[in-house]
Amino acid sequence: MSVEWFDRESLDRTIQDRIQKTDVVLDVGCGIRPQAFFVPKLHVLCEPYAEYLRILQNRYAQRSNVLILQSRWMEALRALPDRAVDSVFLVDVIEHLEKEEGTRLVAECERLARKQILIFTPLGFMPQDYASGERDGWGLTGIEWQVHKSGWTPDDFDASWRIVGALCRAMADDGLVDHAYDRNRTLVYGLANRAQIRTRVIEYYLRWPTGQAKGGQVDRPDYFS
């Protein structure tokens, strides 16, 4: 497993450059903000919460390339055959699951993805709780889906993963500001190219670009502190 550290701006550019623009994408637990790195020919959105789902249905009502499923991840993914999609995205998902369940989810993604998996998650456990009756970061009622239950570090991923991370001071994303991001945090992307993992791991990593983006790399943080 390889780990690189960047400033936030360089991290976003690096991930955008490394993601493969594939035809069929499974976007698990997307909430109201599905991945927007590229537009696939078929974008399958898997979202369990009804209020989020209605927003997605209204937003993509005229988009023939978007298929929306109301389902928890386990039921949806286990119904699919091996290598059913090109890419799987887990954007701010696994930290909302207990560690054992999150590990099972990642394993299912590895079974399904033909080409790549992308995971975006805070580095380590970052507490995020809500009081009864409080609204979530989108001003909606999905607080039970927004509680953090686990933390993840590069050591949770094997050698098939390319890990890149960035140190961030708070987090703001198009007007979405989560109250839990109130001090320095580290965010991590995990990217696995499934097409070569099993047979060409060593060669694959030797051939991977260095990731030296404009602005340069930053020092690796001590994520156990």
Residue ranges and their predicted role:
Residues 1-19:
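Class I SAM-dependent methyltransferase Rossmann-like catalytic core
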Residues 3-5, 74-78, 98-225:
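S-adenosyl-L-methionine-dependent methyltransferase catalytic module, highlighting the catalytic core
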Residues 16-129:
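Conserved SAM-binding loop
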